[in-house]
């Protein structure tokens, strides 16, 4: 379990997260919804260890507790933490002309037995991760020439390579934290990526927290929904329980209605 308890985050005297608690369970995809500026990326940063709880971090005051598999997050050293959780931040374009394969291989360095010494097996994992991300054709491409959507798929392959399970070894639960992974993707690739995330959450026993802006995507691909507004979780639970007009209006300040899609999976959320 990756859990945060009673988080308070403030920056420049302004509260960003206020007494927030959340649990990310292995084998489960949790979608985090909220309007722009609600604190979603801040929460993900705290859970990732980029904003450590218990003091000042990057100009923010952070209070509260975060634990990963029962261990305080701040007590886990960086190499071990990198093997237990992977983070896909919002889109950022590399400044150097790495190939897509070289970017994906960055995810394997936490597993190297000697600094910088990757193996043939790491290369095989990179190839499989690119295939899972639908990015095999981009293998040799210079990442500075890729479109936003192509780069997003390569970076997704990188975090898959980072959490790739070793053969025959029991693994502690691991966690995948995704910040708007579908923002640059077309319709088909949005659903393909989230389908892959949900399948791997079960096959690899991953706890997943993904920030998404489209509640319709969350309804179809998440096991649980957490809605964030004014620095607090205002609703959380199964999609059918949470994605209703009243909680959505509270989360987004926007009235919606539900339309039967006719497929028995989830209703479509449209403006009221």
Swiss-Prot record:
It is a peripheral membrane protein. Residues 2-255 form the ABC transporter domain. It is found in: Cell inner membrane. Pfam families: ABC_tran. It is an enzyme of class 7 (translocase). SUPFAM superfamilies: P-loop containing nucleoside triphosphate hydrolases. Disulfide bonds: none annotated. Coiled coil: none annotated. One of its GO terms (cellular component) is plasma membrane. ATP binds at residues 34-41. Its EC number is 7.6.2.-. Gene3D superfamilies: P-loop containing nucleotide triphosphate hydrolases (3.40.50.300). GO terms for molecular function: ATP binding; ATP hydrolysis activity. Keywords: ATP-binding, Cell inner membrane, Cell membrane, Membrane, Nucleotide-binding, Translocase, Transport. PROSITE patterns: ABC_TRANSPORTER_1, ABC_TRANSPORTER_2, HMUV. InterPro entries: AAA+_ATPase, ABC_transporter-like_ATP-bd, ABC_transporter-like_CS, P-loop_NTPase. Belongs to the ABC transporter superfamily. Heme (hemin) importer (TC 3.A.1.14.5) family. The complex is composed of two ATP-binding proteins (HmuV), two transmembrane proteins (HmuU) and a solute-binding protein (HmuT). Part of the ABC transporter complex HmuTUV involved in hemin import. Responsible for energy coupling to the transport system. This is Hemin import ATP-binding protein HmuV. It comes from Burkholderia mallei (strain ATCC 23344). The lineage of its organism: Bacteria, Pseudomonadati, Pseudomonadota, Betaproteobacteria, Burkholderiales.
């Amino acid at each position: 379990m990756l859990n945060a308890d009673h988080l308070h985050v403030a920056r420049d005297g302004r509260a960003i997260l206020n007494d927030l608690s959340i649990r990310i369970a292995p084998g489960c995809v949790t979608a985090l919804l909220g309007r722009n500026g609600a604190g979603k990326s801040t929460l993900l940063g705290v859970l990732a260890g980029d904003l450590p709880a218990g003091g000042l971090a990057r100009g923010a005051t952070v209070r509260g507790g975060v634990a990963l598999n029962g261990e305080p997050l701040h007590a886990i050293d960086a190499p071990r933490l990198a093997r237990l959780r992977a983070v896909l931040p919002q889109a950022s374009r590399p400044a150097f002309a790495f190939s897509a394969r070289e970017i994906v291989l960055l995810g394997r360095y936490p597993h190297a037995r000697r600094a910088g010494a990757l193996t043939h097996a790491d290369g095989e994992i990179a190839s499989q991760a690119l295939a899972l991300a639908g990015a095999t054709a981009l293998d040799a491409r210079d990442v500075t020439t890729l479109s936003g959507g192509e780069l997003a798929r390569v970076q997704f392959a990188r975090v898959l390579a980072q959490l790739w399970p070793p053969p025959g070894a029991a693994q502690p639960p691991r966690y995948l934290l995704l910040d708007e992974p579908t923002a640059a993707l077309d319709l088909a690739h949005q659903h393909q990526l989230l389908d892959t995330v949900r399948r791997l959450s079960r096959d690899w026993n991953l706890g997943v927290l993904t920030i998404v802006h489209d509640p319709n995507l969350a309804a179809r691909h998440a096991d649980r929904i957490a809605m964030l507004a004014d620095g607090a979780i205002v609703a959380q639970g199964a999609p059918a329980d949470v994605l209703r007009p009243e909680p959505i209006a509270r989360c987004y300040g926007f009235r919606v209605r539900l339309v039967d899609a006719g497929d028995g999976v989830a209703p479509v959320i449209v403006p009221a």
